[in-house]
Amino acid sequence: MGLTYQLIPALVCLLAFTSTFVHGQNFNNTLKEIIKTLNILTARNDSCMELTVMDVLAAPKNTSDKEIFCRATTVLRQIYTHHNCSTKFLKGLDRNLSSMANRTCSVNEVKKCTLKDFLERLKAIMQKKYSKH
């Protein structure tokens, strides 16, 4: 019995370490998938890339990544629900970004940009984030 009580703290620490490791791996895999999808989308030269979207990536410096990703998912949803544009890729991008974002956020941007510019800037943000991990 004494050995069991001695093993419990060690097992708890081991469990905590492995869950942190798995979470880190999932995060890196999500970032890779987002960047891959953005590479595919930004390589396209169809008319959808010229659509005007809210420039939510031009947020103040003190805006958290989770808030920026939440706003980006809002823009993506508006595109694929109102336009028949690369829906499969935009939905996948939305799903992956949502896993890294706040659940709710407000989007009231006045500035606009093209979808292509939006996706290019989002790709740069994600590549920078990936290089830090």
UniProtKB/Swiss-Prot annotation:
Q: Please give the function described in this protein's UniProt entry.
A: Participates in at least several B-cell activation processes as well as of other cell types. It is a costimulator of DNA-synthesis. It induces the expression of class II MHC molecules on resting B-cells. It enhances both secretion and cell surface expression of IgE and IgG1. It also regulates the expression of the low affinity Fc receptor for IgE (CD23) on both lymphocytes and monocytes. Positively regulates IL31RA expression in macrophages. Stimulates autophagy in dendritic cells by interfering with mTORC1 signaling and through the induction of RUFY4.
Question: Do the record's keywords include Disulfide bond?
Answer: yes
What does UniProt give as the signal peptide span? Answer: 1-24
Q: Which Gene3D superfamilies match?
A: 1.20.1250.10
Gene encoding this chain?
IL4
Gene Ontology molecular function: any one: cytokine activity
* Glycosylated residue positions: N28, N45, N62, N84, N96, N102
State the organism named in the record. Answer: Felis catus (Cat)
* Record's subcellular location: Secreted
Q: Which domain of life is it from?
A: Eukaryota
Its taxonomic placement starts with:
Eukaryota, Metazoa, Chordata, Craniata, Vertebrata
Spell out the protein name for this chain.
Interleukin-4
Q: Which family does it belong to?
A: Belongs to the IL-4/IL-13 family.
